[in-house]
Amino acid sequence: MFAARQLSAPWTLCPSTTEADVVREWLTWASVGMEGVVFKRLNDVYRPSVRGWQKYKIRETSEAIVGAITGSVAAPRTLLLGRYDGKGRLQYVGRTTTLARAAGAAVAGLLARGRRGHPWTGWSFSAGWGSQEKLNVTLVEPELVVEVGVDVARDASGRWRHPARWHRARPDLSPADVPRLTSPPR
C-alpha cells in the first residue's frame, strides 16, 4: 500500500511482532522517537472512534520550573512548566494534569505571585492540544523546581506532547539545576 500510493512523511509504516523480546527491545528506542507500543488482537482492524487497542507509553521522570499556574496561588490546579533555553530564556515545555488536593496544598506554600518583568508576561497559553481557547493563568516567580512524570514524546520545539504528572516539589534544586531545553521554540 505504501509503495502503490507513494506515501511518505508524515506517514510511517509501523512494524509489528508477537515476540515479547522484540517489544522489550523497541521500548529501549525512546531516544530515536519510539513513544511506546500498541497492543491489539491479531485479527483486529482499525475502527475510527472505537477504543479497542491499548497503548503502553514510555515514561520518564524529569525536572522543570513552575512559571505559571491555573487556579490560585493558594490553591493551584495545574502547573505550567518551563526550562531555560541556550540563551537563558525561560521557555514553556508543558503543563501538568490536574493536581490532587494534597499536591496543590503542598505546592501552594512554595509559590510566589509573579513580579513585573516575569519572562512569560504577555504570553498566552492554549487550554489544550490544538485548542483555540486561551487558558486563564496566574504567573508565579520561576523559582520552584518540580519533578514530573512525562511521556518521552516531544514536539518539534522540544515541548512535552502530553500532560506531565506531578511527582513532587524539589526545593533541594534551583532552576539552574534543571536540564536546558535542547530544541528551543522558534
Ranges and model annotations:
Residues M1-R186:
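Catalytic cores of nucleic-acid ligases and guanylyltransferases
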